[in-house]
Amino acid sequence: MTKFIESPAVKKLCELTKESYLRYWDERNGGNVSVRLEASEVEAYEDVKEVKRVLDLGFDASTLAGYYYLVTGTGRYFRNVTNQPLLDLGLVRISEDGQKAELLWGFEDGGKPTSEFASHLMSHIERLKVNPNHKVVFHCHPTNLIALSFTQSLDERHLSRLLWKMQAESIVVFPEGIGVIPYMTPGTNAIGEATAAKMAEFRAVIWPHHGLFAAGDSLDETYGLIEVIEKAAMIYSQVGTQGGKILQEITDVQLQEIAEYFNMTPHEGFLDV
């Protein structure tokens, strides 16, 4: 039997945390990720059989009882994960009463899951209600998207339209648009609850002046969603450096045509068609 460190989940998470760091989306200890794993993805490994520690969650996650999550650690630097996954990552199982996380692997130096873990689990709960295949929550700090939260109205319709119009790919990748919450203190249950409420409708939620919470069926899909959103924000920033005057754009009619061609349904009321 092989070790869990050799699992596809650990290898992929090491790859993407390093890539996200290199893009300056996860400076210092910024950013966190959690991945729901099926029992079949865990139980084949010999070193995940015993509970090593039990950690309080701080809220009721009973609807996730028995679920496994691979999660990044609190205070950990994404740039280090690929070299020391046994310290910076942890595999936990949600206890039967939903109040605790049972550590099965990782965090070997006494570490704990990210301080945003409650927020992650709240979003996992909401996304699973609308998509039973949902698995990933990824939080990072995309530079150009954060900048938009200083210069643009924090209105979901406005920001979704702005990002859709920057490239033809946007409306295909996130046809529901992008959610926004007010600025809130990170790490609190309150920000987790506000984000989870938006996750019922959107797979990506802006935390103004802070970053992005994104969700998806796999690490690749979720990271790709972030890439497309940040690319659109980057194009808008580049337009600004060229004088900011837009001479031609993707029209609402053209956005609707793109969505129809790819069998996507844009968020109701976001297009003027």
Predicted regions and their residues:
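Glycine-rich flexible loops
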Residues: 1-273
